[in-house]
Amino acid sequence: IAVAGPVTDGEIDLTNSPWRVSEAELQTLGLKPVKLINDFEALAWGAPVVPRDELASLGGPEEGDPESAIAVLGPGTGFGVSALIRDFHGREMAMPSEGGHACFAPGDPVEDEILRILRRRYDRVSIERLICGPGLLNMHRALAEIDGRESHIDDPAEITATALADPNSPCGA
């Protein structure tokens, strides 16, 4: 069973949720055997079967080495990060992480300003403070402040819907 958060000794505290799940408790329901794994670890294991035309290159040549590492990144209620790597014998290993908790590192003056704005609200600004559902709202509000405009949007889904309906709107820009 794949769940959001780090698995420790067969137990997991779900990320962004008060729930705790354990293999032992699930086995009392008659589920045997039970193995809990991180949701992005599961996605890393599945990455090699994703059709090539469904993948996006984030740098380097479009046709990379088929034996190279595969990064899996994805926003949701948080920002998931994992990788599928191969050892020197060619054996695959899925490497889950809590990479969404890494600090946001601005790359230009606008991102510097976004960080400055978010630091007024948060002691520490991680990647998932920007890239996930709730993070989308943080980013939208920061960009509105930078642009000197008001935003009355309180729902990340509304930002997405507005951007899809009008790519030239502040939500889509």
Where are these regions (language model features)?
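Short beta-strand-loop/turn "lid" adjacent to the catalytic site in phosphate-handling enzymes
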Residues: I1-I37, E41-E54, V72
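Short, acidic Gly/Pro/Ser/Thr-rich loop/turn segments
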Residues: P6-T8, G78-S82, N138
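Conserved active-site and cofactor/substrate-binding residues in soluble primary-metabolism enzymes
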Residues: V21, P109, E113, I131-P134, ...
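Residues on a specific face of well-ordered alpha-helices
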Residues: A24, T28, A42, F79, ...
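Short acidic/glycine-rich loops and adjacent helix/strand connectors
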Residues: A24-P33, S97, L118-R120, N138, ...
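ATP-dependent carbohydrate kinase catalytic cores
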Residues: K35-G64, D154-A173
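Glycine-rich phosphate-binding loop of actin/hexokinase-like ATP-binding domains
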Residues: G59-E128
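A mobile "lid/hinge" subdomain adjacent to the ATP/sugar-phosphate binding pocket shared
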Residues: R121-A173
